[in-house]
A protein has these predicted regions:
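Gram-negative bacterial Sec-dependent N-terminal signal peptides
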Residues: 1-24
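Mature soluble binding/inhibitory domains
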Residues: 21-251
Length: 251
């Protein structure tokens, strides 16, 4: 897949949002501040008080709280509840944060400062504000020149279940192409595309949900030897199906 279709490129430009600092790469499937989307990911901006974290680390913010000032994911995780599936949950009804901030489900790639998950304003299935995101530190500055690598990945979509979608991501550094799949309770997704080392997204291509719904897949590699991966699959106006995913090289 050396040339992405015009439809895929249009989806990519109109719906995905990319953010990069010296240390952190982030993306989300819907634009902050548009159509009720109040979540924003990027580098941490807050280094004092109870939400302190290292400036530049992976961070997350909400428009109702200090106009979207981002706090570190490490701090955010400490205020969430980890469920039996290893997913951190934070909802407006909890006492850990102010009301009317929506529902979060997110998790962390093992042994890495790479986070992925989703948010919606109400947490009710069908909420069009649903936004998938990832934010990671130590993006891979160079990728392997050859070889095939399999990653064990998990996905997050709060409307699919409170757990994780399971799957694999296969990078062929010889042909500079990738394939992948994610399986959940209601969502079954395949993806494929090109590995583009010098682009903002180091992999970029297509996705198909439930054998018929066309979408976009994109993301980045992390670690000194591309040991981790994180990305998003998004489906145009059907944002309730958007999934964030991440994982590590299979053992």
């Amino acid at each position: 897949m050396k040339n992405l279709s015009l439809a895929v490129l249009t989806i990519a430009l109109s719906t995905s949002v990319f953010s990069a600092s010296a240390t952190t790469i982030s993306a989300q499937s819907q634009k902050y501040g548009v159509d009720g989307v109040e979540v924003i990911v990027g580098d941490n901006q807050y280094a004092s008080g109870s939400h302190a974290g290292a400036i530049g680390d992976p961070g997350i913010g909400l428009q109702p709280i200090f106009f979207g000032t981002r706090i570190s994911f490490a701090s955010f995780k400490a205020r969430a509840t980890e469920n039996e599936h290893g997913v951190y949950e934070l909802a407006a009804s909890t006492s850990a944060h102010s009301a009317n901030t929506g529902k979060f489900n997110f998790t962390q790639v093992a042994n890495a400062e790479v986070y992925f998950g989703d948010w919606s304003k109400t947490g009710i299935d069908g909420d069009a504000t649903h936004t998938a995101f990832y934010s990671g530190k130590d993006v891979s500055e160079s990728l392997p020149n050859s070889g095939q690598v399999e990653y064990t990945i998990a996905g997050i979509n709060q409307f699919d279940s409170s757990g994780k979608l399971s799957g694999t991501f296969n990078a062929d550094f010889d042909t500079k192409e990738y394939t992948g799949s994610l399986s959940g309770h209601e969502l079954n997704i395949t993806m494929s595309g090109d590995i583009l080392e010098q682009e903002q997204y180091q992999f970029n291509g297509t996705a198909i949900a439930n054998e018929s719904i066309e979408g976009h897949s994109y993301g980045n590699f992390f670690g000194a030897d591309a040991t981790e991966v994180a990305g998003i699959v998004s489906f145009g106006s059907e944002h309730i199906k958007d999934v964030a995913f991440g994982g590590s090289k299979a053992q």
